[in-house]
Amino acid sequence: MTDRIELTTANEFIARHIGPRAADEQAMLQTLGFDSIEALSESVIPESIKGTSVLNLPAGQSEADALASIKAIASKNQLFKTYIGQGYYNTHTPAPILRNLLENPAWYTAYTPYQPEISQGRLESLLNFQTLISDLTGLPIANASLLDEATAAAEAMTFCKRLSKNKGSQQFFASSHCHPQTLDVLRTRAEPLGITVVVADEAELGDVSDYFGALLQYPASNGDVFDYRELVERFHAANALVAVAADLLALTLLTPPGEFGADVAIGSAQRFGVPLGFGGPHAAYFSTRDAFKRDMPGRLVGVSVDRHGKQALRLAMQTREQHIRREKATSNICTAQVLLANIASMYAVYHGPRGLTQIAKRVHQLTAILAEGLSTLGLKAEQAFFFDSLTLNTGSRTAALHAAARARHINLREIDDQHLGLSLDETTSQSAVETLWEIFASDGQNLPDFTALAASVPSRLPATLLRQSAILSHPVFNRYHSETELMRYLRKLADKDLALDRTMIPLGSCTMKLNAASEMIPVTWAEFGNLHPFAPAEQSTGYQQLTDELEAMLCAATGYDAISLQPNAGSQGEYAGLLAIRAYHQSRGDEHRDICLIPSSAHGTNPATANMAGMRVVVTACDARGNVDIEDLRAKTVQHRDQLAAIMITYPSTHGVFEEGIREICGIVHDNGGQVYIDGANMNAMVGLCAPGKFGGDVSHLNLHKTFCIPHGGGGPGVGPIGVKSHLAPFMPGHARMERKEGAVCAAPFGSASILPITWMYIRMMGGEGLKRASQLAILNANYISRRLEEHYPVLYTGTNGLVAHECILDLRPIKDSSGISVDDVAKRLIDFGFHAPTMSFPVAGTLMIEPTESESREELDRFCDAMIKIREEIRAVENGTLDKDDNPLKNAPHTAAEIVGQWSHPYSREQAVYPVDSLIENKYWPPVGRVDNVFGDRNLVCACPSIESYQEA
């Protein structure tokens, strides 16, 4: 009998996404004592929430069919030549950066560099980014990116509030020349904090003594280049701080903010090689004075040394961050925009100071030629000085001119019914300028002579604001200008790191799963990448279809009634969700409801976000099994009944189990007038099995960069949409270009829109059946690891059935007591085995939290378990005295190649150090540095590129 031939390709992608083969799956189930994956699911999911998920989704499509489907959607977007500007510009992504970085899984599948020894490549690139920002802004300390320019402005506002000596003030000045989307996000952030944002023309500003800070745009949104020096002095005299939103390309030619007194500079690095992407993702920047460094938001790369004294990089001053300081953190930011910051960094490396300056001069000269030509046509720019943007008083011709431009497939900025705006960029050419003259010319007018104007038009930058200081003098910006050199530099950096292209990354709570190539392909299509977020709606019908379909898919997966795709990180999704709850209570006259209950096990973003949303945090206890202590919750809910706003709870719990009492918890909160926020960080265990919107949740955020396959990018981008029940739908984030105008949490209507195709592709190829199997296999893989390792390390928490959800926590505290070996020692020793460490000391100090995801094969799971078992044997050798308690492979891990070929004085062999298991002989990862000295790095903070001599020593 011949085998039956399968004539359909539906659902074929499921087996590509899921790691274990059928035989492996059965063997793993038998290890756990189950005969089917359904039986395991039935045992793990609590009875009270079974049947809450009904995935009403079509069958999965093949990769080829899904790509054809999304290509048809993308083709509905119309790509006009765009001069809208307003913080978003066309740009050329250099091909070697596109191919070797953006499309390279060695870069886009990496995790945030909390483990510095295996992250030196992207840390170096981020240090280059920080140096770029510091140089261009004239301020000594810059962070490693924020989410977008508007949210960076909001961070600057709260930064000024913390540091201003004008402590009694609740007023923040924002220039009316700032980008409109920035002003909207400022208002959203300010309201829960009791801050009043005063928007006015700085030229009409009188007394400034009532302000704690100010935000100025440089150049202004309308194109003007203002001299802010006197204004900055006035604010400083009133004990206020000044933030400047500055265009990076313009800063190659203009006096940097730090040199005219600004305390903070913020902005976007988008025009440094990152496509428009219908609004994102793009890396924002934040730089400030050295005295303020410990109050900066976001991550900061610093220079330190390893245990051998060799230069090494690391994330510095982490005590500022939400995962440590919780509600007292400087910000709730977790995910940033590392991948996009690295693109901008390499754009600067590739072009160098001369190349960037030449681009800026070309853009400015073309703008000056355009303005002069328009002047001869009777349209004089309103700006005396400008860099790349013009405002034209077009009067009664405005509508006709706009229509004429549209007819030529050109978008102009519609300022009002009397004015049009134009912003040029590095893609603008002579022919583009001449086409604009044709549009603006009246019938019978002779067009200007481009060549003649090019020879005679002077600069329109103010002489008093021309940049005098040098930029990008460090060798890294002056070496890699040929494609060959840049390609090899990118390869050298990538080889220093561990990402998913080399190994499993078993980080608990982080869901480091497959980012399939077919999901990634549409991201770099021009139809998705080259659309301005403020283009007319009829030009973005493809995006509208994509977002409508994706919202419906996510509603089906979560059980919620409505979805907002605007938040561009999980932390921002949390914020949007709590703002929706806050607005809901206010709409009912319950403004006094401001208590947010948060379990003690919660991720640090939860209390930090509640604080940002104007809520007071009350912590509830957890019991010995890691579950929410329901009696403590009940008591505190009753105690705060009249002020209760919400509870924030993660499900499955942060401890890696499905809590049996989740419905009861939701009921207690609802009965006392509160709303239930279910943190969707662990949604990877629930899709197709149970739905938060059906078992008591009122709102959840989802991490598309976890459950739904958007890559982590080394620390961003992420997308954190929120799902809500119908009563909260009117309070989801709005935008000036949407039906609801208020409540924007980021600059663009759909946030990081250009990476939404990744999630659409994943869901479309998996279908309902595949999504359910992904959850089931994630649970199977976690329980398999738990079972294999429980004889060697105590599994700290399990459900009532002795099973975990999609992750498990190993308790290393007894090992620390018996041997002196710490969780850090085990994490660093795993590097010698070629693994990224699991999550360390969260949610319990002295533990490792392991999440394998469904994408890892049994072979890889066994390789990890074998490594952990081998490490336990080494620990036993320390315990029984066979290995020295201080000089052993764990305390000295990780071991570098340089160390192995150098003088060897350890009481264990070189072979034991670097080849503890035979499989490493054919495939060995060599860390570029030894264990990094964290204390040295914070005590001797250096956050810009060190000298070339130190690179040579490295």
From Swiss-Prot:
Cofactor(s) the protein requires to work: pyridoxal 5'-phosphate
Classification via Pfam families: GcvP2_C (PF21478), GDC-P (PF02347)
EC number: 1.4.4.2
Molecular function GO labels: glycine binding; glycine dehydrogenase (decarboxylating) activity; pyridoxal phosphate binding
Gene Ontology CC annotations of this record: cytosol; glycine cleavage complex
Record-listed N6-(pyridoxal phosphate)lysine modification sites: K706
Biological processes annotated in GO: glycine decarboxylation via glycine cleavage system
InterPro entries (UniProt xref): GcvP, GDC-P_C, GDC-P_N, GDC_P, PyrdxlP-dep_Trfase, PyrdxlP-dep_Trfase_major, PyrdxlP-dep_Trfase_small
Keywords for this protein: Oxidoreductase, Pyridoxal phosphate
Reactions catalysed, as given in the entry: N(6)-[(R)-lipoyl]-L-lysyl-[glycine-cleavage complex H protein] + glycine + H(+) = N(6)-[(R)-S(8)-aminomethyldihydrolipoyl]-L-lysyl-[glycine-cleavage complex H protein] + CO2
Residue spans crossing the bilayer: none
Uppermost EC category: oxidoreductase
Family: Belongs to the GcvP family.
HAMAP family with a match to the protein in the record: GcvP
Function of the molecule: The glycine cleavage system catalyzes the degradation of glycine. The P protein binds the alpha-amino group of glycine through its pyridoxal phosphate cofactor; CO(2) is released and the remaining methylamine moiety is then transferred to the lipoamide cofactor of the H protein.
Subunit structure of this chain's protein: The glycine cleavage system is composed of four proteins: P, T, L and H.
PANTHER family: GLYCINE DEHYDROGENASE (DECARBOXYLATING), MITOCHONDRIAL (PTHR11773:SF1), GLYCINE DEHYDROGENASE, DECARBOXYLATING (PTHR11773)
Protein name: Glycine dehydrogenase (decarboxylating)
Record organism: Pseudomonas savastanoi pv. phaseolicola (strain 1448A / Race 6)
